[in-house]
Regions:
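Short acidic DE-rich linear segments
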Residues: 83-86
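Acidic, low-complexity, intrinsically disordered interaction modules
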Residues: 26-74
Length: 86
């Protein structure tokens, strides 16, 4: 992981917290689905417009910061959803 750009540090840190917790994000723009999964938790599943919005926001982040890999953007954008498990 490269954290050289201070403007993207917050996203790298969020992705690291998510990975350290065993959380994964699986997106499929072709089927308009997003699944956020963690060990011992019920999956958070989005489809249709909700999934499309999530995927679009991840793409915007990725386009704005080209050094940010898409998987890091997805993990960072998914972090607020994990509050549903609290």
């Amino acid at each position: 992981m490269s954290k050289s750009n201070p403007r993207t540090r917050i996203f790298w840190d969020a992705a690291k917290r998510m990975r350290d917790a065993g959380i994964t994000v699986d997106t499929d723009s072709g089927y308009s689905t997003v699944s956020i999964d963690a060990p011992g938790q019920e999956s958070i599943f989005m489809q249709g417009d909700e999934a499309d919005s999530f995927i679009e926001e991840c793409r915007k982040l990725w386009i704005r910061y080209p050094s940010l890999p898409m998987d890091v953007a997805e993990l960072a954008m998914a972090e607020p959803y994990t509050d549903l498990w609290s």
